[in-house]
Amino acid sequence: MKIVFITPTTGLRRVPLYRAGGHVYGQYNSITGPLILGGILKRAGHEVEVYEELNGSVNYKKLLKDTDVFCFSVITSTAPRAYELADMIHEKSGARVLMGGMHVTAMPQEALEHADQVITGEGEKVILDVVEGRIKDRLVAGIPIEDLDEVPFPDYSILKTQVEAANVLSTRGCPFRCTFCTTSRMFAPYRQRSVDNVIEELRMYKKLGFKYMNFEDDNFTADKERAKEICRRMIAEGLVFKETFFFGRTDMANDEELLNLLSEAHLTRVLIGIESLNQKSLDSIHKGQNINDIRRAGEACVKHGIRLIASVVLGLDDDTEEDIKRSVDFAKDIHAYQLQPAVLTPYPGTPVYKQMVAENRMIDDLNWSSYDMMSVVFQPKNMSPWNLQELFYKMGKYFYDFKTSKLIGKLFGREYGVRRWIFALYTRLGVFGAHIASHVKGSPFWKIKNTAWMFADKAASADAEKSTATA
């Protein structure tokens, strides 16, 4: 059989200009799931191709002619696109459609309206039986893998869209339980691969000629001693790439040996969740860090030549507009290389989603494609949805000023100063595009801008229900 894996993306992200901007942010890379699952099917004798819409065009007209099974990896923001493609496939061919991923794990019945079968959770142990028809249930529960060393390495030979950086997932899950995060719920419990197994995968990528690498772990430095050992082995065995990206936490700043090893092993770009400079907000999301940790982490990263991507969550219940501005000011003060402002997004299956639904605070008129951490999909406590949406763009524009590009160039090198200047340009293009969209009736931004009536109606309905109940 011919099996095609598709990682869909939203409409804007398929625009060449957006793809070019994403390339400035980081190297083209592909999520590991389809490459692992596809490799399992390939070794069983099937013809397999993997496509990532974010990284290139997909010729569906050609694929429809000879594909037996389409497999979609779905997150919340890409669900409408996945459903659209699934419906088109059913209309124009006899191919089967399978779906898996974070969103369909949380919303399986919704996905079954478009897919022939849905796999929830981890799919490695069931994918072959599902594809070959031995498992016929429409809803298939994946089986968590206890020993991650049993998971085969991603097979990049089946990837048909462009790639520059290899992705390594050395753990699954996260030992922390932030209330807005889907990972610790999709991939529980937290598990680690052995250091030997990780190093073996890195050797493969060196042989394949990759110059860039990403650790996909939600927190690569959660186990500091393990992270140190991986770095030592990378250095000793010549497995140092031009640049390796990773996710970290503020507490890595407390370990000088770890910071030195990260730098020497070229793990020189890190995303750290600052989230907020309001301690009450940090405590409310169970972040487990304090403001002093955040400052130390920023200073330590600059000292060791590690470029910090500061992630700030906008719209937490205890945060005011001033708190958000203070967080972005702080990111500038510690010379963060990039800012990732993320609008609080209530993803299905998370405590935040349950809270927002229970409190009747969701913007009902938006579909899943707006759940992209760039769009406001709920009623914040301390401002209107549109105020928060405007803050998202204002803070990005404020952080990415052209003048700071020169300083970044001095701190990290000319290449990164130029990239920072391009970030500033693209941010302004994005702000301008959002401004135009907010005036187009029916667009997501227009809906966010005009939601006051909705929440007034909701409040009136709630009051009416209370009156009826007490009568």
Question: Each PLM stretch: what is its role?
Answer:
Residues P108-E113, D318-K332:
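Catalytic cores of alpha/beta
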Residues L98-M99, I119, V140, F245, ...:
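Structural detector of well-ordered beta-strand residues that form the stable sheet scaffold
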Residues G38-E47, L208, A265, A297-L308, ...:
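A structural motif corresponding to the C-terminal end of an alpha-helix
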Residues P8, E53, M102, D218, ...:
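Cofactor-binding loop segments of dinucleotide-utilizing enzymes, especially the Rossmann-like FAD-
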Residues P152-I309, L316, D329:
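Radical SAM [4Fe-4S] cluster-binding motif and immediate context
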Residues M1-Y212:
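Acidic, low-complexity intrinsically disordered segments
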Residues K2-F5, L12, L17, K42-E47, ...:
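Radical SAM enzyme core and accessory elements
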